[in-house]
Design a protein with these regions (language model features):
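Pyridoxal 5′-phosphate
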Residues: 1-243
Length: 243
């Protein structure tokens, strides 16, 4: 079983043309779970009940700024509104596309802040392709973390890894993909292995005694708590192989 699971991972790396700087993390059932996993890794996600219990207040001046596009799926915008960050939506231009001038204005105004940008590659509604190469180039010039929602685009195209730092995918949108798992593609340098994993479950630990624990250093291992989605991950791999 482990062998088939790792073969699936290697197949995904090949078919998605991923560099050695990235890892693939199976996440829930689709892009929504992949975005949540990303937010957890970057310290942005916080459960609403925790907010209520401890009365969290965000200082807009010091919180990360998350920039999103004008036609994002709810998961790629509303979820960030509830996270520990400030959200800025980029306007549409006169042609109904991403207003790149507005993007530059927002970046210049906030260049002193930590900036995370998350744009869809293709609209779930219209299929319009976002100018992701130009957007990435602009964001890189401001040292922003670049994220792409590839839910609607990955059945048809790959995105070169130098253009992004994290990508969210829903293999269930591919032929043969239903019942697969969501995928988070993330640059290894964004994952802090000096702290506990996002969930300290079975399989994430290296050693445990009565009072302390040491966690695995391998990112894929420490970020797949409990029983891994073996069949779902293999199905995702086969779907991209068929593509």
């Amino acid at each position: 079983t482990t062998n088939y699971y790792e073969l699936a991972r290697n197949s995904l790396i090949k078919n998605l043309e991923l560099s050695n700087d990235f890892v693939i993390l199976p996440s829930g059932y689709g892009t929504t779970a992949a975005i949540k996993h990303f937010q957890e890794l970057l310290g942005l996600y916080i459960p609403p009940a925790t907010k209520k219990r401890f009365s969290f207040k965000i200082d807009k001046k010091t919180a990360p700024l998350v920039i999103v596009g004008p036609y994002e799926h709810h998961s790629n915008e509303v979820s960030f509104r509830e996270a520990l960050c400030e959200v800025q939506r980029i306007n549409l231009d006169k042609q109904g596309l991403v207003d790149l001038n507005h993007l530059k204005e927002v970046l210049e105004k906030n260049k002193h802040r930590e900036i995370i940008a998350s744009f869809t590659i293709a609209s779930n509604v219209t299929g319009i392709i976002t100018p992701y190469e130009e957007i990435s180039k602009i964001l890189r010039s401001y040292s922003a973390i670049v994220c792409f929602d590839a839910a609607a685009s990955s059945p048809y195209m790959n995105i070169p890894t130098h253009l992004y730092d994290a990508m969210f995918m829903s293999p269930h949108k591919l032929l043969g993909g239903p019942a697969s798992c969501g995928l988070l593609i993330i640059r290894k340098s964004l994952v802090d292995t000096s702290i506990a994993p996002t969930f300290a479950g079975g399989g994430t630990v290296l050693y445990v005694n009565k009072t302390s624990q040491t966690y695995q250093n391998d990112i894929e291992t420490r970020e797949t708590a409990g029983t891994p989605p073996i069949l779902q991950f293999i199905r995702a791999s086969l779907a991209y192989q068929l593509r």
